[in-house]
């Protein structure tokens, strides 16, 4: 395969030994202006992006398991709007920016790509293991975890042909939004 790091033009067959460079560069955190939400306790909204090194790279999934856990933590609680959801594309897009739900745009959620409503929704595998009730701004604990214990495998995936898997103009793919005070 000519795109492999160890490509050998003289190779006569594919022996499965090709290695490929990772398109992943880093994680990037950005603060979102949430002043229209009229929060009273100094809440701040953050967006977490994966930065990639090429516009044709894509992220189709992220997962956690027994040896590779995920943890997103705060010293307070995560904000969860009453019309919100734990995965961005499960939020009703028509409510975002509506006077009926002025803080919905600042809900805490995970995603792959930036779309409230997509043709192909993200698939959550083993949803019970995500511990989504932890995204609860009124009574919830201060962290969100996945993986790290026996039989805690969990994944969020999109089909590889889903446009949400591709990076934006800054070569970033949105992974989540988290509002906390």
Segments from the language model and where they lie:
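Primarily marks secretory-pathway-exposed extracellular/lumenal segments that are disulfide-
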Residues: 1-181
């Amino acid at each position: 395969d000519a795109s492999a790091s160890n490509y050998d033009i003289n190779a006569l067959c594919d022996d499965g030994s090709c290695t490929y460079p990772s398109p992943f560069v880093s994680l990037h955190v950005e603060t979102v202006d949430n002043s229209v939400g009229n929060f009273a306790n100094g809440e701040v909204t953050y967006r977490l992006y994966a930065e990639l090194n090429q516009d044709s790279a894509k992220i189709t999934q992220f997962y956690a398991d027994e040896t590779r856990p995920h943890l997103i933590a705060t010293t307070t609680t995560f904000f969860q709007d009453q019309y919100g959801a734990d995965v961005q594309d499960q939020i009703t897009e028509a409510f975002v920016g509506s006077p009926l739900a002025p803080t919905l745009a600042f809900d805490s959620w995970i995603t792959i790509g930036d779309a409230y409503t997509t043709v192909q929704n993200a698939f959550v595998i083993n949803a019970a293991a995500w511990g989504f009730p932890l995204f609860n701004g009124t009574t919830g604990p201060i962290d969100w975890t996945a993986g790290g214990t026996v039989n805690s495998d969990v994944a969020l995936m999109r089909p590889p042909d889903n446009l949400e898997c591709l990076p934006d103009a800054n070569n970033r793919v949105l992974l989540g939004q988290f509002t906390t005070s």
